[in-house]
Every structure is written in structure tokens, then in C-alpha cells.
Amino acid sequence: MAGPAFRAAAVRVRVPATSANLGPGFDALGLALGLYDDVVVRVADSGLHIDIAGEGSETLPRDEKHLLVRSLRTAFDLLGGQPRGLEIVCANRIPHGRGLGSSSAAICAGIVAARAVTIGGEARLDDAALLDLATEIEGHPDNVAACLLGGFTLSWMESGAARAIRMEPSDSIVPVVFVPGKPVLTQTARGLLPRSVPHVDAAANAGRAALLVEALTRRPELLLPATEDRLHQEYRAPAMPESTALVERLRGDGIPAVISGAGPTVMALADADTADKVEALAGTDWAANRLGLDQQGATVLPLATASDT
């Protein structure tokens, strides 16, 4: 069977940062944020060349070990074969190791770019297969679902396959993220979780997660009670005591705040009237950023021109 044909032109993919869990929605809920990585991929005659600017430019590998490249390769295998060479340019803005979905962004950028640069790629790898592949690489669907679909997502596993639905978050919600200077490895944060939790805590989280869907989509005034968690944030506190303290301080002031993903970033769900005040609470140990909500998810864009901003 003949391998795939590839486009001669480069493709540009933009992927959003994401925040998973959102308090009670452990490994299920995700929110796409208005902070983006851009990747340009072109099929070349031979070799592999990677240029990286921004986050991770001094630490990320520039060879087959790069998660983006591994994701490209995995997708190309499913699409029917590898190109002879690749040229990749990365403009990274999503902080690494901070709980904002940088690994999911790399995975989604890689598989979306592979499909886009392959002629007939969408017929060979449809959107459902794309989500399943991203989940297989990442290990859980919450971040990759939000990264691919945008908006507010609920994801789950069914008979070994990833599934997700996209919902429209209320446009009154203004996420404010507090990013600390030091990362926490996802493996470290996950390693602190117990094998079992009390039934009463599981029941409480089920109720709060259901409430959170209503709060994020239609009734943001319920976000403070809806973001309560008993399954993971307390157990992870030893790895990020400053983050835990900030969440408690913000919530004590009536501000819905959670650990973003596996941490250590803290995310507050403010509104237009309170976002500036919330952002000012960062202090010197945090980089506070007021972000929009991303509605598009992973997107193939025209190549940048001199007029792009």
C-alpha cells in the first residue's frame, strides 16, 4: 500500500493553554484559556530541524525526544507513513510544568499538524480518532479534550476510547492565573494521591462537579461552592504549600480559586468587575495573568505575515 502524500507548503497550528480539574472535576473537566503556543511544520527532503523560541527554549530537546516530534511521528504512523524530513518552528508562550497544559499543547499541536500536512489527512484521522490518539499519548483526556475542542469540556473513557463533549462557558467569566517561579512535575503531584478516598468525599465531589457544569455555563454566581474539592488538592498540598495557601486565601475572600491541573499554578475565576482586583492580589512571588477564554481549540491558521500581531 502506498504511503501518504504530503503538502509542499508549511502548516501553522495554534493550540491553547488549558486548566484541568477546576476543583472537583478530577481528570474529567477542562477549560481552554487564551494563551497560545504556535507551531509551524513543513515537510522537508531529509533530516529533522527544530527551532524553539519562548518557554522551554533553553531546556527542550531538539531531536526525536521532543514531545511534539514524538506526537507528530505517532500521528504520521496512523496516517500511513513518515515524511522524509521535517522542519519545525515553535513559538512557546505556555509555561512548562505549571499546570497549564503545556504537554497537552505539544501533543495536540503535533497530531493536528501531522493531519494538516498530510493530503487527505482528515479522512484518515477524524476528530474522534484525534482525541483518542491525544489521550493515548497524554494518558488522560481532560487537558487534551479542552485543547482540541476549546471552551469548557467534559471528557471520559468508554470501552478504552476517549470521549468528550464541549460546552459554552459563560462569557462573564474572566480567568486569572497566578504562576509561580518554580515548576512541579505532574508525576510528583500524581504520586501524592491516595489509592482510595472516603466515600463521603467521593460523594461530595460528585455533587460539586455536577454543580460546576451549571456554574461555568449558566450561573457563575455558584462558582465558589461549585469549585470545592476533596479528592486531590489537599493531598497535593505538600508539593505546593504556597499554592495551597493562596487558594485558601482567595477562597476566604469569596473568590472561586483552584489549583490548575496538577499545579502549582492557581487559577481564580473572576468577572469583569473583580478581575483587576484579583490580579492585584498576586504579590511578588507570582506572575498574575488575566486571560480570556479560548473558544476555538487547536486551529490550523494561515502562515504568519509581517502584518500579524
UniProtKB/Swiss-Prot annotation:
Matches recorded under InterPro entries: GHMP_kinase_C_dom (IPR013750), GHMP_kinase_C_sf (IPR036554), GHMP_kinase_N_dom (IPR006204), GHMP_knse_ATP-bd_CS (IPR006203), Homoserine_kinase (IPR000870), Ribosomal_Su5_D2-typ_SF (IPR020568), Ribsml_uS5_D2-typ_fold_subgr (IPR014721)
Keywords: Amino-acid biosynthesis, ATP-binding, Cytoplasm, Kinase, Nucleotide-binding, Threonine biosynthesis, Transferase
Localization annotation: Cytoplasm
Pfam families: GHMP_kinases_C, GHMP_kinases_N
Broad enzyme group: transferase
Pathways involved: Amino-acid biosynthesis; L-threonine biosynthesis; L-threonine from L-aspartate: step 4/5
Gene Ontology BP terms: threonine biosynthetic process
Entry binding sites for ATP: P95, H96, G97, R98, G99, L100, G101, S102, S103, S104, A105
Catalytic activity reported: L-homoserine + ATP = O-phospho-L-homoserine + ADP + H(+)
GO CC term (a single one): cytoplasm
GO molecular function: ATP binding; homoserine kinase activity
EC assignment: 2.7.1.39
UniProt similarity note: Belongs to the GHMP kinase family. Homoserine kinase subfamily.
Biological function: Catalyzes the ATP-dependent phosphorylation of L-homoserine to L-homoserine phosphate.
Name this polypeptide is given: Homoserine kinase
Gene that encodes the chain: thrB
